[in-house]
Structures are given as C-alpha cells and as structure tokens.
Amino acid sequence: MSIGEVDPLERLRQICLALPEVTERLSHGEPTWFVRGKKTFVTYADHHHDERLAFWCAAPAGAQAAMVAADPERFFRPPYYGVRGWLGVYLDVPNVDWAEIEDIVADAYAQIANKR
C-alpha cells in the first residue's frame, strides 16, 4: 500500500465501530461486526471465495438486485447471505467511494438494529 492509500479493513472498521452498540469479532476467520453482540450486519471478505477483496452486508429489500444490476463491477450477490438479500461490495476497485460505503453500512446497520 502506498503512502496516502486507505487500508480498506481499517476504514471499514472505523465506519462500523462508529455506530451504536456495535462490536467486532472474528466469524469464520473474517472480521465481522455485530449489533448488540448478537446479530451480524457486516462481514469482511478477504478473498473468501475468489481473488477479490470485499465486504458483505445486510441490505434493504430490493437493494441487492438493483445495485448489482446497475454496477456489477462494484456490487455482487455474496455466497451464503445473498439468498437473504445481502449485498456484496468490492473494495479492490479504483476510487472506492467511502461516503457511499458509509451509507451502505448505515443501511445494513438499520436493517439489523431495528429488528429486536
């Protein structure tokens, strides 16, 4: 990583841990973020099923299909969680839009945190 480049894991960690009642622990060998210590809302995917760096997150109904159709270079249907509508977001693309990722993570958090 060159000077000035953002470490994707560290930036994602900052975004997730800034939200209320969020904790981090390893799940299936990957950093994963939980709401109130129980429900996963984001999991890091460091070359989990392919050669890509990404994260998987909860998403509002219909968001996965719309985002993957609109930009398959940046978004995908993740294994395991994709069937539940979760969204995969590639972090190894040029010019990662961290403001957009903050919004995606906030939406993921809301999907899980609002379920009590």
State where each predicted segment sits:
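Charge-dense, helix-prone N-terminal extensions
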Residues: 1-116
